[in-house]
Amino acid sequence: MDRKIILDCDGVLLDWAYAFDVWMFEQGYKRLPDTDKYYDQSLRYGINNNIANDLIKVFNESGCVGFIPAYKDSVEYITKLYNVGWRFEVISCLDRDKYAQKLRVNNLIHLFGNVFDFIDCGLDFKVGKKQYLLDRYSGKDYYWIEDSVDHAESGRKIGLKSI
């Protein structure tokens, strides 16, 4: 077995939700109480879905993406797994903006070190990962760590071991 783990970035490696909350507060928005359980930002902020998606796009194209902190204990466990021979690839729906992508890559390397064999953070969050996963990983027996149920299911359907 190839000891490879495919990783989502936001909510797995980086605490995107925390950084987005800080940024939204700076834009004058306040998250609704007891909304941690929601993945959908329109529900977390009580705003129209189109407005939420527009705000996500602005955030994902901002310099903030170069400074998102690590998610919980992700650095500790990625380092441990790397030290026992696991390899990692990162697939992320950030934005098509090349500067935002470079900031994301630099932030990942700054936080985790040079542990990633491949990083693609240029997927459009409005499109998703289904076709990309199919094209790149179909038939592979890799682990797939993803915080979105829809994306995790897309990986499972092509043979990845979704966690």
Regions found by a protein language model. Give the residues of each.
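Short hydrophobic segments within beta-strands
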Residues: D8, I91-C93, I145
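Short catalytic/ligand-binding loop motif for oxyanion handling, primarily in non-cytosolic enzymes
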Residues: L14-W16, V22, F88, D97-Q101, ...
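Anion (oxyanion) recognition and catalysis
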Residues: F25, T79-N83, R156
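A structural signal for isolated positions on well-ordered beta-strands in alpha/beta enzyme cores
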Residues: R87-E89, Y143, K161-I163
